[in-house]
């Protein structure tokens, strides 16, 4: 009887350890989806947390030589393209034949990547298509892990349904539908989190759901509804402010995030989408650092 009790106890302990390991893994996977979906939503409007980005341009110089053995008989022709006044530049390839030589140079430049300098650019639909297609592969593994836990099966199945909808809207290059369908995907994350993570993690996701709701509503410029969503976000964030654990660990971060959230709400009185995006970007950068 003693041996049976010991074996049963070990089996239960191993089972609990396996469950805890799986929960930890699923929490990391939810964090991945959190970052991935926010980044994808930002790309729709050319928003980035980086104020500068590096880009490159290739320029080609051609030389033709008549091979005559006379002084000053060589004629060179060079035609650069791109702005050489920017930073960087190095030769990447050099090819020659009997009478001609060509040299290709890659010019590296630093470009401003703020809201006001990027918003007039077209949405990179090809990039979005690639990101969503890659998400299918990631989700198949994540869904399998979630099925091993106490997560509602309907909520798990809903992700694939919404992912199909988002992919179709991206394929159709429909901006408004794309943002709404990506938001539906993100809104599932707190439901998953409540089964595997602590209250802090879930409360942060709930707060971001409301802020992303406001972000998506900028397409309609419905400022009254945007303000309501941000009021909901402030109420959700109250759970973070009142949480002793996270305040002990990072009180400065909690306070700064709250200030930026209030500033985001106040800026809606201006009723300017670009100003909203600037404040939205600052808030999202800060709250992502709390996790």
Regions found by a protein language model. Name each.
Residues 11-291:
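Mature extracytoplasmic or organellar-lumen-exposed domains after removal of signal/transit peptides
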Residues 5-9:
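C-terminal motif of bacterial Sec signal peptides marking the signal peptidase cleavage site
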């Amino acid at each position: 009887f003693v041996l049976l009790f010991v074996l049963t106890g070990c089996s239960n302990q191993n089972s609990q350890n396996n469950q805890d390991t799986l929960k930890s893994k699923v929490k990391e996977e939810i964090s991945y989806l959190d970052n991935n979906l926010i980044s994808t939503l930002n790309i729709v409007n050319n928003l980035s947390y980086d104020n500068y980005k590096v880009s490159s341009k290739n320029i080609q110089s051609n030389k033709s030589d008549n091979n005559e053995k006379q002084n000053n008989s060589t004629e060179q022709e060079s035609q650069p393209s791109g702005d050489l006044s920017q930073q960087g530049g190095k030769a990447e390839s050099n090819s020659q034949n009997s009478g001609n030589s060509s040299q290709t140079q890659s010019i590296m430049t630093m470009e401003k990547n703020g809201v006001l300098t990027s918003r007039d650019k077209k949405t990179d639909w090809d990039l979005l298509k690639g990101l969503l297609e890659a998400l299918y592969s990631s989700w198949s593994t994540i869904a399998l892990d979630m099925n091993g836990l106490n997560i509602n099966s309907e909520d798990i199945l809903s992700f694939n349904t919404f992912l199909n909808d988002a992919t179709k809207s991206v394929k159709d290059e429909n901006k408004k539908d794309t943002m709404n369908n990506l938001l539906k995907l993100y809104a599932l994350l707190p439901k998953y989190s409540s089964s595997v993570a602590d209250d802090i993690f879930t409360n942060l996701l709930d707060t971001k759901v409301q802020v992303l709701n406001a972000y998506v509503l900028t397409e309609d410029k419905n400022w009254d509804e945007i303000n309501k969503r941000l009021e909901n976000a402030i109420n959700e964030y109250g759970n973070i402010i009142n949480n002793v654990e996270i305040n002990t660990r990072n009180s400065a971060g909690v306070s700064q995030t709250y200030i930026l959230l209030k500033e985001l709400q106040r800026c809606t009185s201006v009723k300017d989408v670009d100003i909203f995006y600037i404040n939205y970007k600052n808030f999202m950068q800060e709250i992502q650092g709390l996790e």
